[in-house]
Amino acid sequence: MTAAFTVVIPARYGSSRFPGKPLKTIAGKPMVQLVWEQARKSSAERVVIATDDARIVEACRAFGAEVLLTRDDHNSGTDRLAEVATQLGLAANAIVVNVQGDEPLIPPAVIDQVAANLAKHPEAGMATLAEPIDDVAALFNPNIVKVSTDINGLALTFSRAPLPWARDALARSKDELPADVPYRRHIGIYAYRAGFLHDFVSWGPCWLENTESLEQLRALWNGVRIHVADALEAPPGGVDTPEDLERVRRLLEA
């Protein structure tokens, strides 16, 4: 049985790379609605959209979602979730799953999986998911975050760079994946306990987080363990660019 949890979908209008992204239409619906519909198919007790923009609030109310207006000065989606946890009055041990607002194809099964993994691993302050990288272009793509873990499935680091660097193999060729190196792509879904979210905000960003623009590095920087498992069902990839949007449109509008 999956532990009780709440899904929060952070949705920013003012993305520096792709402004207005949550309201871009796919198959006649705003993208954030598709994410919400997928989250509603999970075992979550509650699904809430969190945004700093009145246009997104209006759109979400139009399709029947619970939506909260948050401050517009948060450093990351996790900082925004901490405000939501306070607004909802969640207990410190309540599990919150952060489903990115640009993942319209997120499988409901992985939402349940990441919540269950956190519940099963009290040594971890966060849980997240990954999948194997089988394409050398993905290894060198900075929009695809790489994750390395220890023997217990706990994250060692996350990076946009091709880590670990296979020194000898990549010196010979960068046109094929090095053999016997288990490269993994991080899937941007997180589970946390509500109490941890408040700690996360109190620490503030660290230089490593700012350098890579990866909020999970703040947790590692402060000694928090992050559990990483291979996703039961890998999502086909989120929408980071207009090209990604067209790819998802082709999948859903075919």
Curated annotation (Swiss-Prot):
SUPFAM superfamilies: Nucleotide-diphospho-sugar transferases. Its EC number is 2.7.7.38. One of its GO terms (biological process) is CMP-keto-3-deoxy-D-manno-octulosonic acid biosynthetic process. Its main location: cytoplasm. InterPro entries: Cytidylyl_trans (IPR003329), KdsB (IPR004528), Nucleotide-diphossugar_trans (IPR029044). The keyword Cytoplasm applies. Pathway: Nucleotide-sugar biosynthesis; CMP-3-deoxy-D-manno-octulosonate biosynthesis; CMP-3-deoxy-D-manno-octulosonate from 3-deoxy-D-manno-octulosonate and CTP: step 1/1; Bacterial outer membrane biogenesis; lipopolysaccharide biosynthesis. It is found in: Cytoplasm. Pfam families: CTP_transf_3. Gene3D superfamilies: Spore Coat Polysaccharide Biosynthesis Protein SpsA, Chain A (3.90.550.10). GO terms for cellular component: cytosol. It catalyses: 3-deoxy-alpha-D-manno-oct-2-ulosonate + CTP = CMP-3-deoxy-beta-D-manno-octulosonate + diphosphate. One of its GO terms (molecular function) is 3-deoxy-manno-octulosonate cytidylyltransferase activity. Signal peptide: none annotated. Keywords: Cytoplasm, Lipopolysaccharide biosynthesis, Nucleotidyltransferase, Transferase. Belongs to the KdsB family. Activates KDO (a required 8-carbon sugar) for incorporation into bacterial lipopolysaccharide in Gram-negative bacteria. NCBIfam families: kdsB, PRK05450.1-3, PRK05450.1-5, PRK13368.1. This is 3-deoxy-manno-octulosonate cytidylyltransferase. It comes from Pseudomonas syringae pv. tomato (strain ATCC BAA-871 / DC3000). The gene is kdsB.
